[in-house]
Amino acid sequence: MENLSFLFLFLFFYILGSIPTGLVIGKLVQQKDLRNTGSGNIGATNALRVLGKKWGILVFLLDFCKGFVPLTICLHFSKFWLTEPSTKTFLQPNPTIKISLLAISPILGHMFSLFNKFKGGKAIATSVGIITAFNPLIGISGIIFFAIFLRLFGYASLASIIASTLVNVFYG
């Protein structure tokens, strides 16, 4: 039963991660297909570039929540269903491995969207949501570093590299 619950959660988190929020928001609010404008990516950075600040931030928050919300709920309830098996086999890995696999699931969904011909974004916001669920201090620090360097330099790619480097320097 435990493996069935795990499989259900893995698939549910994958499907949740597969929702192409940038694509949906772009089509709903400005009738723009992010796949055909800007960088062609459906993630928050291209949404910011093509749709503007308000909608780009909304896409970031929704993509962030695709990682943060399910993993936070899972971590909260894991003590009830993730027990250490009496005998470890490949089919019954330890709880840490199960949580790690569940954390990867929305990332895979975002990158290989079931609703977008298995194409998606880079899963940066979703990954930040997962990191924040595991360790809020690290996640929030990364977001703050990113915001500072995005404001200073105006390039999301450069801000991402600097933010991830600084997070590793301070917490790695």
UniProtKB/Swiss-Prot annotation:
InterPro entries: G3P_acylTferase_PlsY (IPR003811). The keyword Plastid does not apply. It is a multi-pass membrane protein. It catalyses: an acyl phosphate + sn-glycerol 3-phosphate = a 1-acyl-sn-glycero-3-phosphate + phosphate. Pathway: Lipid metabolism; phospholipid metabolism. It is found in: Cell membrane. One of its GO terms (biological process) is phospholipid biosynthetic process. GO terms for cellular component: plasma membrane. One of its GO terms (molecular function) is acyl-phosphate glycerol-3-phosphate acyltransferase activity. Its EC number is 2.3.1.275. Keywords: Cell membrane, Lipid biosynthesis, Lipid metabolism, Membrane, Phospholipid biosynthesis, Phospholipid metabolism, Transferase, Transmembrane, Transmembrane helix. It is an enzyme of class 2 (transferase). Its main location: membrane. The chain crosses the membrane at residues 6-26, 55-75, 95-115, 130-150, 152-172. Pfam families: G3P_acyltransf (PF02660). Catalyzes the transfer of an acyl group from acyl-phosphate (acyl-PO(4)) to glycerol-3-phosphate (G3P) to form lysophosphatidic acid (LPA). This enzyme utilizes acyl-phosphate as fatty acyl donor, but not acyl-CoA or acyl-ACP. Probably interacts with PlsX. Belongs to the PlsY family. This is Glycerol-3-phosphate acyltransferase. It comes from Onion yellows phytoplasma (strain OY-M). The gene is plsY.
